[in-house]
Amino acid sequence: MSTRNVRILAFAGSSRAGSYNVRLLAHAVELLRARGADVDVLDLGALDLPLYYADDEAAHGAPAGVQRLREAMRANDALLIASPEYNCFFTPLLKNAIDWASRPDSGQPSPFAGKFAALLAASPGALGGVRGLPALRILLSNLGVLVLPGQLAVPLAHEAFADDGSLRDARLEKTLGEVVGALLTAFKPA
Protein backbone atom coordinates (compact mmCIF):
# COMPACT_ATOMS: atom_id res chain seq x y z
CA MET A 1 0.00 0.00 0.00
CA SER A 2 1.44 3.38 -0.98
CA THR A 3 1.28 6.39 1.26
CA ARG A 4 1.59 10.08 0.58
CA ASN A 5 1.94 13.20 2.63
CA VAL A 6 -1.17 15.07 3.67
CA ARG A 7 -1.87 18.00 1.34
CA ILE A 8 -2.99 21.19 3.05
CA LEU A 9 -4.37 24.36 1.53
CA ALA A 10 -3.46 27.36 3.67
CA PHE A 11 -4.99 30.81 3.33
CA ALA A 12 -5.60 33.92 5.36
CA GLY A 13 -8.76 35.94 5.66
CA SER A 14 -6.67 39.07 5.16
CA SER A 15 -4.65 40.34 2.24
CA ARG A 16 -3.54 43.53 3.98
CA ALA A 17 0.13 44.43 3.65
CA GLY A 18 1.77 43.48 6.94
CA SER A 19 -1.16 41.29 8.00
CA TYR A 20 -0.57 39.54 11.31
CA ASN A 21 -2.66 36.62 10.07
CA VAL A 22 -0.51 36.22 6.97
CA ARG A 23 2.54 36.17 9.29
CA LEU A 24 0.92 33.62 11.58
CA LEU A 25 -0.09 31.49 8.61
CA ALA A 26 3.44 31.64 7.16
CA HIS A 27 4.91 30.40 10.44
CA ALA A 28 2.32 27.61 10.69
CA VAL A 29 3.13 26.60 7.10
CA GLU A 30 6.84 26.38 8.02
CA LEU A 31 5.97 24.09 10.92
CA LEU A 32 3.78 21.90 8.71
CA ARG A 33 6.41 21.58 6.00
CA ALA A 34 9.06 20.75 8.60
CA ARG A 35 6.81 17.85 9.64
CA GLY A 36 6.47 16.56 6.08
CA ALA A 37 3.21 18.11 4.90
CA ASP A 38 2.72 19.34 1.37
CA VAL A 39 1.27 22.83 1.76
CA ASP A 40 -0.17 25.11 -0.90
CA VAL A 41 -0.56 28.74 0.15
CA LEU A 42 -3.31 30.71 -1.55
CA ASP A 43 -3.72 34.50 -1.43
CA LEU A 44 -7.47 35.10 -1.46
CA GLY A 45 -6.93 38.75 -2.40
CA ALA A 46 -5.06 37.74 -5.55
CA LEU A 47 -8.09 35.76 -6.76
CA ASP A 48 -9.88 39.05 -7.44
CA LEU A 49 -13.28 37.64 -6.49
CA PRO A 50 -16.22 39.95 -7.03
CA LEU A 51 -18.78 40.22 -4.27
CA TYR A 52 -21.03 37.17 -4.61
CA TYR A 53 -24.25 38.11 -6.38
CA ALA A 54 -26.54 35.33 -7.63
CA ASP A 55 -27.76 37.27 -10.67
CA ASP A 56 -24.18 37.81 -11.88
CA GLU A 57 -23.43 34.13 -11.34
CA ALA A 58 -26.55 33.16 -13.33
CA ALA A 59 -25.66 35.54 -16.16
CA HIS A 60 -21.90 34.99 -16.36
CA GLY A 61 -21.01 31.86 -14.37
CA ALA A 62 -18.25 31.67 -11.82
CA PRO A 63 -15.22 33.92 -12.41
CA ALA A 64 -11.80 32.39 -13.08
CA GLY A 65 -10.68 33.10 -9.50
CA VAL A 66 -13.53 30.99 -8.17
CA GLN A 67 -12.48 28.08 -10.36
CA ARG A 68 -8.88 28.45 -9.13
CA LEU A 69 -10.11 28.42 -5.52
CA ARG A 70 -12.29 25.34 -6.06
CA GLU A 71 -9.48 23.49 -7.85
CA ALA A 72 -7.03 24.30 -5.05
CA MET A 73 -9.52 23.09 -2.45
CA ARG A 74 -10.24 19.85 -4.31
CA ALA A 75 -6.51 19.16 -4.76
CA ASN A 76 -5.89 19.28 -1.00
CA ASP A 77 -6.98 17.13 1.93
CA ALA A 78 -7.21 19.76 4.64
CA LEU A 79 -7.49 23.49 5.22
CA LEU A 80 -5.48 25.79 7.45
CA ILE A 81 -7.18 29.16 7.83
CA ALA A 82 -5.96 32.25 9.68
CA SER A 83 -8.43 35.09 9.95
CA PRO A 84 -8.54 38.39 11.75
CA GLU A 85 -11.66 39.43 13.57
CA TYR A 86 -13.77 42.26 12.20
CA ASN A 87 -16.52 43.30 14.61
CA CYS A 88 -16.60 39.87 16.32
CA PHE A 89 -16.77 38.03 12.99
CA PHE A 90 -14.36 36.68 10.41
CA THR A 91 -13.53 38.87 7.44
CA PRO A 92 -15.69 39.74 4.42
CA LEU A 93 -12.84 38.56 2.16
CA LEU A 94 -13.01 35.09 3.70
CA LYS A 95 -16.82 34.98 3.77
CA ASN A 96 -17.03 35.95 0.10
CA ALA A 97 -14.48 33.30 -0.91
CA ILE A 98 -16.37 30.62 1.02
CA ASP A 99 -19.68 31.75 -0.49
CA TRP A 100 -18.29 31.49 -4.02
CA ALA A 101 -16.54 28.15 -3.42
CA SER A 102 -19.67 26.62 -1.90
CA ARG A 103 -21.86 27.26 -4.95
CA PRO A 104 -22.92 24.22 -7.04
CA ASP A 105 -20.37 23.45 -9.75
CA SER A 106 -21.65 21.40 -12.72
CA GLY A 107 -22.06 18.15 -10.83
CA GLN A 108 -18.63 18.36 -9.19
CA PRO A 109 -18.45 17.37 -5.53
CA SER A 110 -18.33 20.20 -3.05
CA PRO A 111 -14.74 21.37 -2.56
CA PHE A 112 -15.47 21.30 1.17
CA ALA A 113 -16.53 17.63 1.22
CA GLY A 114 -14.40 15.44 3.46
CA LYS A 115 -11.99 18.19 4.48
CA PHE A 116 -10.45 18.73 7.88
CA ALA A 117 -9.63 22.26 9.00
CA ALA A 118 -7.63 24.04 11.66
CA LEU A 119 -8.32 27.65 12.60
CA LEU A 120 -5.97 30.42 13.64
CA ALA A 121 -6.43 34.10 14.41
CA ALA A 122 -4.21 37.03 15.32
CA SER A 123 -5.18 40.51 16.38
CA PRO A 124 -3.57 43.50 18.05
CA GLY A 125 -6.41 43.33 20.59
CA ALA A 126 -6.33 41.47 23.88
CA LEU A 127 -8.53 38.61 22.65
CA GLY A 128 -6.47 37.76 19.58
CA GLY A 129 -9.40 37.45 17.20
CA VAL A 130 -10.98 34.56 19.08
CA ARG A 131 -14.51 36.00 18.82
CA GLY A 132 -14.55 35.54 15.04
CA LEU A 133 -13.57 31.87 15.08
CA PRO A 134 -16.86 30.35 16.37
CA ALA A 135 -18.82 31.75 13.42
CA LEU A 136 -16.20 30.45 10.99
CA ARG A 137 -16.29 27.06 12.71
CA ILE A 138 -20.10 26.90 12.36
CA LEU A 139 -20.04 27.90 8.70
CA LEU A 140 -17.37 25.38 7.75
CA SER A 141 -19.09 22.63 9.74
CA ASN A 142 -22.35 23.33 7.91
CA LEU A 143 -20.46 22.86 4.63
CA GLY A 144 -19.24 19.41 5.69
CA VAL A 145 -15.79 20.32 7.00
CA LEU A 146 -14.58 18.65 10.18
CA VAL A 147 -13.11 21.60 12.06
CA LEU A 148 -10.64 20.38 14.65
CA PRO A 149 -11.36 21.45 18.23
CA GLY A 150 -7.94 22.96 18.91
CA GLN A 151 -7.35 26.48 17.65
CA LEU A 152 -5.03 29.39 18.32
CA ALA A 153 -5.79 33.07 18.82
CA VAL A 154 -2.75 35.33 19.16
CA PRO A 155 -3.43 38.50 21.17
CA LEU A 156 -1.34 41.66 20.93
CA ALA A 157 -0.14 40.45 17.55
CA HIS A 158 1.83 43.63 16.91
CA GLU A 159 4.19 42.43 19.66
CA ALA A 160 3.81 38.66 19.22
CA PHE A 161 6.31 37.76 16.51
CA ALA A 162 10.06 37.31 16.84
CA ASP A 163 12.36 38.37 14.01
CA ASP A 164 12.44 34.79 12.68
CA GLY A 165 8.62 34.69 12.41
CA SER A 166 8.07 32.45 15.41
CA LEU A 167 5.86 33.47 18.32
CA ARG A 168 7.67 35.10 21.23
CA ASP A 169 5.33 33.57 23.82
CA ALA A 170 6.41 29.96 24.34
CA ARG A 171 2.87 28.93 25.31
CA LEU A 172 1.43 30.29 22.07
CA GLU A 173 4.23 28.65 20.07
CA LYS A 174 3.48 25.33 21.80
CA THR A 175 -0.24 25.67 21.06
CA LEU A 176 0.50 26.42 17.41
CA GLY A 177 2.61 23.27 17.24
CA GLU A 178 -0.27 21.30 18.74
CA VAL A 179 -2.79 22.74 16.27
CA VAL A 180 -0.69 21.93 13.21
CA GLY A 181 0.18 18.53 14.66
CA ALA A 182 -3.50 17.74 15.11
CA LEU A 183 -4.17 18.70 11.51
CA LEU A 184 -1.46 16.33 10.32
CA THR A 185 -2.69 13.41 12.39
CA ALA A 186 -6.41 13.96 11.70
CA PHE A 187 -6.08 13.02 8.06
CA LYS A 188 -4.44 9.71 7.28
CA PRO A 189 -4.06 9.48 3.49
CA ALA A 190 -3.90 6.08 1.84
For each predicted feature, which ranges?
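Short beta-strand segments enriched in small/hydrophobic residues
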Residues: 7-14, 118-121, 165
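N-terminal beta-loop-helix "entrance" segment that forms/cooperates
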Residues: 44-61, 160-164
